[in-house]
């Protein structure tokens, strides 16, 4: 029965179809068919030939197997051949069977192998046995994995599926066809499942992409980090290497800096041997070259000095003059000495490791070879006892005399150079039996001081003052004609004017006071003294030996030793060439100090300088205070007019203005007082206006009452004699007792004025002095306050003025007040003065070898001042309390000054103390026309560089020859000759149409001021003593005006003016 059912199922087409579909589902998933399904399918496709052969395919109803048709025969043959071949699946089964048989045979062989074989072979056989036993498991796993992979690859996208094989119910029966509800539910479920599967696959793909990207980016970041780490490690290595190199160089620099500091300390302490040792250790070729060159210079100088000494000892003057050509060979150091001497020096240098001090030793030994101790002062000195440093100065001058050399006594001002000189003359007279004659040259202002000092200290020495009128000088010449005198004292003008008489005398010593006047070797005075007089020895006295260039230093050395220092060019090359060859444009501090040190050693044997701080430790101190003040509206107006158009409004009644030249001087006049521009017809004796019109006068009006009440006495210095006239008016209006001394004061009156001011109970509160006439050689220790009304371009002039009070004999603290207008040209002058004062510690300025500071620089400085105009005037004006704090010496004085200011403010009802803009006179304003603008443009063309004009010469119009002829002739005064020459030159220039204008530089201004002072001194001698009073501002005849409030006698100006103010 079962067998019948099986046969029935096998013959049922529906069952066969189901079996085929199930087999197809398995095969689509690449799965193995179950055995019963495989048997069913095999029974369907692999029927026996016998079952199939009887039923060939029918070809219609009339089928005949042997019909003879060609096509029919071919089809039959093809069908017969197909039945003889095996199917693909059958071949696969046969192949699989063969593999299984082989595996089975191999397993049998491996299991039957004996166990006594080698271990390696036994291990291989066991591995192969285990692998063959796992073959079925391996095939099954591989089939499942392959099926899943194929399904994922081909069935992930529903659109790519030809048929939903996964929904086939493999072992189940199908539902009835036509059940729409079931089919729809099936479709919905299938769509949902497909959507979920697609979403899951998309999520997995997205995660895979993100994972891949993260992995890639992580690899990139890791590579970047690794690269950065490598770079950082490389940088660290480079930094460590660079730090090591910098540390090494830093140590080298520190070592070099320490060595340089040690060398500089050795230079400052003047330890030459230590410095030379350190210089050799440094191996600095530049320094070594300079030291070698300067050593050669010292060797040559020492040889020349010794040769000059030998020539003088032989007393063969002709031989000395004839050997000038030989002595000029000093310029070439190796040609000065004989060949034998050069060889000796070279061998010594080689033996002593190139001793760089040998030349300096020879130089010093050649000069001060004869030594003489001076332990006490000469008995001829009766006026007092010399101080220890003055005895040392006397011994130094005696050493110069014994060695037959000249020198410079350059002690600081106030240390008694005059007394030391008198002590030298007395010592020579007493110990050397040298009676003279000696010639003393000094500025005209200090001649009475020399006469008084001789009378006080050495009355037994016959000293004559050679000065005065022609008749008086003739009388003096008659008295000294027989040579019965020891000393003749005169000034610079007479040494040239009376040269015909004075050059006939053989002078033993010529002593030049204020010897810095000879810093220009081309001046008439230097030429006259160098060629026209017979002088055995020379001595220069100066408190300011500071020179600004090698040329000025050489001028002094040339005057002292003309046969040794005979060429300025070679002298400059000695110190310029070593550094020029090294190609260095600027010098280091050590090189600069070394040059200065070597120059010091050149001039040291011939120069002696001591400072007050070194020798006078108990001398009261000196304090300089800069008092800055504002300018009045009138001053600011004039200052603006000068800087804008170069002209100012005048009190002429017609509204005209005056064109100005020398703008630097005009700006300084604006800072001092506007009255310096007005004419003589203007009433200047108005007490409130003269104070309120000037900021400096307003400051003085507050300062002077305080100083007088505190018991101080004042020296006031100014460079303008017209300003001193205004100060006289102010002092007279305020009942201050004063004296006055300037270039026009006669020589005999100067001593009287000094004596009146220095008396113990002198009633005079103030002494008015011009900076250049009153700042030289005067002893005014009774004053303890100095007011510099307007600073000089040359700070040494102000220094000279300050030391009139700060000198030996001063018992009080000296306070110096420098008045400066805020924001004006005076601040520039003060700054330049500070720069120049920096030279004092070096003797020669730092810019010695770079002389680029020319007139062009000064012109640019003035151009900057002019362009700035009045923009900075009146800024940061100090308060009254600040001024009181600066002016007071003690706390009690300060509170006294404060109380006086408060009382003054209440009395004035707190009015403004300076003139305001509405109070400025209308005529002071200028109407700027087109012509004025054109003239102003042309006037400032030299400043802006648009026009080039000829520079006006403000020096003396006379040549040296004309000046000397004027000095020798008594018929005509030199000042008149100069004025005639100037008038002639002016006419010539006007006829040629030359109207050139120029702006003076600071050096031109200094020359002009010196010339004015010299003309004052020379012109005053020809004036009559009883002169009628004048009320004029003209300066070509007189340098000051006369006013009714003062007496008219010029000889008693100081007394008369003070007598007129004795009401207080």
From Swiss-Prot:
Region (Disordered): 924-955, 967-1064
EC number: 3.6.4.12
Record domain Helicase C-terminal: where: 699-866
Keywords linked to the UniProt accession: ATP-binding, Chromatin regulator, Developmental protein, Growth regulation, Helicase, Hydrolase, Nucleotide-binding, Nucleus
Protein origin, superkingdom: Eukaryota
Binding site for ATP: 411-418
Keyword ATP-binding annotated: yes
Catalytic activity: ATP + H2O = ADP + phosphate + H(+)
Tissue specificity remark: Expressed in embryos, root apical meristem (RAM) and shoot apical meristem (SAM).
Subcellular location: Nucleus
Molecular-function GO terms, alphabetical: ATP binding; ATP hydrolysis activity; chromatin DNA binding; helicase activity; histone binding
Domain Helicase ATP-binding: 398-563
A GO BP annotation: maintenance of shoot apical meristem identity
Biased composition (Acidic residues): 1002-1014
InterPro entries in UniProt: Helicase_ATP-bd, Helicase_C-like, P-loop_NTPase, SnAC, SNF2-like_sf, SNF2/RAD54-like_C, SNF2_N
Function: Probable chromatin-remodeling factor that is functionally redundant with CHR12 in root and shoot stem cell initiation and root apical meristem (RAM) and shoot apical meristem (SAM) maintenance. Can associate with the promoter region of WOX5. May promote seed maturation and repress initiation of germination. May repress plant growth.
Similarity annotation: Belongs to the helicase family.
Name of the featured protein: Probable ATP-dependent DNA helicase CHR23
Higher taxonomy: Eukaryota, Viridiplantae, Streptophyta, Embryophyta, Tracheophyta
């Amino acid at each position: 029965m079962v067998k019948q059912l099986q046969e029935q199922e096998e013959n049922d087409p529906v069952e066969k179809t189901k079996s085929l579909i199930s087999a197809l589902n398995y095969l689509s998933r690449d799965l193995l068919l179950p055995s019963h399904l495989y048997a069913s399918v095999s029974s369907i496709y692999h029927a026996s030939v016998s079952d199939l052969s009887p039923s060939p395919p029918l070809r219609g109803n009339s089928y005949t197997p042997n019909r003879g048709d060609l096509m029919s025969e071919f089809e039959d043959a093809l069908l017969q051949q197909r039945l003889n071949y095996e199917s693909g699946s059958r071949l696969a089964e046969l192949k699989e069977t063969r593999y299984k048989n082989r595996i089975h045979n191999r397993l049998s062989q491996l299991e039957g192998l004996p166990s006594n074989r080698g271990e390696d072979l036994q291990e291989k056989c066991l591995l192969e046995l285990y692998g063959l036993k796992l073959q079925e498991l391996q095939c099954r796993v591989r089939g499942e994995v392959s099926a899943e992979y194929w399904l994922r690859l081909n069935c992930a996208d529903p659109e790519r599926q030809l048929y939903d094989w996964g929904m086939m119910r493999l072992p189940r029966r199908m539902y009835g066809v036509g059940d729409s509800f079931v089919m729809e539910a099936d479709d919905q479920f299938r769509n949902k499942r497909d959507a979920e599967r697609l979403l899951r696959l998309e999520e997995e793909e997205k995660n895979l992409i993100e994972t891949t990207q993260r992995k890639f980016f992580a690899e990139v970041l890791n590579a970047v980090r690794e690269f950065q780490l490598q770079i950082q490690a490389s940088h660290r290595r480079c930094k460590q290497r660079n730090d090591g190199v910098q540390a090494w160089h830093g140590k080298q620099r520190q070592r070099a800096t320490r060595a340089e500091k040690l060398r500089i300390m050795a230079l400052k302490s003047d330890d030459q041997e230590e410095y030379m040792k350190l210089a050799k250790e440094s191996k600095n070729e530049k320094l070594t070259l300079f030291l070698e060159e300067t050593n050669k210079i010292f060797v040559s100088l020492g040889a020349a000095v010794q040769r000059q000494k030998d020539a003088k000892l032989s007393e063969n003057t002709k031989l000395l003059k004839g050997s000038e050509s030989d002595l000029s060979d000093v310029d070439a150091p190796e040609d000065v000495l004989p060949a034998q001497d050069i060889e000796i020096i070279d061998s010594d240098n080689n033996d002593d490791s190139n001793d760089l001090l040998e030349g300096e030793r020879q130089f010093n030994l050649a000069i001060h070879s004869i030594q003489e101790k001076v332990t006490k002062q000469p008995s001829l000195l009766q006026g007092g006892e010399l101080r220890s440093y003055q005895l040392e100065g006397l011994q130094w001058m005696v050493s110069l005399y014994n060695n037959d050399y000249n020198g410079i006594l350059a002690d600081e001002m106030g240390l008694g150079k005059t007394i030391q000189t008198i002590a030298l003359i007395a010592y020579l007279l007493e110990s050397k039996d040298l009676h003279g004659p000696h010639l003393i040259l000094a500025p005209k202002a200090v001649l009475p001081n020399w006469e008084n000092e001789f009378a006080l200290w050495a009355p037994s020495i016959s000293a004559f003052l050679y000065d005065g009128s022609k008749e008086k000088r003739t009388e003096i010449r008659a008295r000294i004609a027989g040579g019965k005198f020891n000393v003749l004292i005169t000034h610079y003008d007479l040494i040239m004017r009376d040269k015909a008489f004075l050059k006939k005398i053989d002078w033993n010593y010529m002593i030049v006071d204020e010897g810095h006047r000879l810093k220009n070797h081309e001046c008439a005075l230097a030429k006259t003294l160098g060629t026209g007089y017979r002088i055995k020895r020379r001595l220069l006295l100066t408190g300011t030996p500071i020179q600004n260039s090698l040329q000025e230093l050489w001028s002094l050395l040339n005057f002292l030793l003309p046969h040794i220092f005979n060429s300025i060019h070679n002298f400059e090359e000695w110190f310029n060439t070593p550094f020029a060859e090294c190609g260095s444009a600027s010098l280091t501090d050590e090189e600069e100090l070394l040059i200065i040190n070597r120059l010091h050693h050149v001039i040291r044997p011939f120069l002696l300088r001591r400072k007050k701080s070194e020798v006078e430790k108990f001398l009261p101190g000196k304090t300089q205070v800069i008092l800055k003040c504002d300018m009045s509206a009138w001053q600011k107006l004039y200052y603006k007019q000068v800087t804008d158009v170069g002209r100012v409004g005048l009190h002429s009644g017609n509204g005209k203005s005056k064109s100005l030249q020398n703008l630097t001087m005009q700006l300084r006049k604006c800072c001092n007082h506007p009255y310096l521009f007005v004419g003589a017809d203007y009433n200047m004796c108005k007490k409130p206006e003269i104070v309120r019109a000037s900021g400096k006068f307003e400051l003085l009006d507050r300062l002077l009452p305080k100083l007088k009440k505190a018991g101080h006495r004042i020296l006031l210095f100014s460079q303008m004699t017209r300003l001193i006239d205004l100060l006289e008016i102010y002092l007279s209006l305020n009942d201050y007792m004063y004296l006055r001394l300037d270039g026009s004061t006669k020589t005999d009156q100067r001593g009287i004025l000094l004596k009146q001011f220095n008396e113990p109970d002198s009633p005079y509160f103030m002494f008015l002095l011009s900076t250049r006439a009153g700042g030289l050689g005067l002893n005014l220790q009774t004053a303890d306050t100095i007011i510099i009304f307007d600073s000089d371009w040359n700070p040494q002039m102000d220094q000279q003025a300050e030391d009139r009070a700060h000198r030996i004999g001063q018992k009080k603290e000296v306070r110096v007040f420098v008045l400066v207008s805020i924001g004006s040209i005076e601040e520039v002058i003060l700054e330049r003065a500070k720069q120049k004062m920096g030279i004092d510690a070096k003797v020669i300025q730092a810019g010695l070898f770079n002389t680029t500071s020319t007139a062009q620089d000064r012109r640019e400085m003035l151009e900057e001042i002019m362009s700035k105009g009045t923009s900075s005037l009146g800024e940061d004006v100090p308060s009254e309390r600040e001024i009181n704090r600066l002016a007071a010496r003690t706390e009690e004085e300060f509170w006294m000054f404060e109380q006086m200011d408060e009382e003054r403010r209440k009395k004035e009802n707190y009015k403004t103390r300076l003139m305001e803009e509405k109070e400025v006179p209308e005529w002071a304003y200028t109407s700027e026309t087109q012509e004025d603008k054109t003239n102003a443009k042309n006037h400032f063309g030299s400043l802006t560089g648009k026009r080039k004009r000829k520079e006006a010469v403000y020096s003396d119009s006379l040549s040296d020859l004309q000046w000397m002829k004027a000095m020798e002739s008594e018929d005509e005064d030199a000042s008149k000759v100069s004025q005639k020459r100037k008038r002639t030159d002016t006419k010539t220039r006007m006829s040629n149409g030359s109207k050139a204008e120029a702006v003076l530089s600071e050096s031109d201004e200094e020359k002009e001021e010196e010339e004015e002072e010299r003309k004052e001194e020379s012109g005053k001698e020809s004036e009559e003593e009883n002169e009628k009073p004048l009320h004029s501002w003209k300066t070509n005849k007189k340098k000051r005006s006369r006013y009714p409030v003062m007496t008219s006698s010029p000889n008693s100006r100081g007394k008369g003016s003070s007598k007129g103010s004795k009401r207080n």
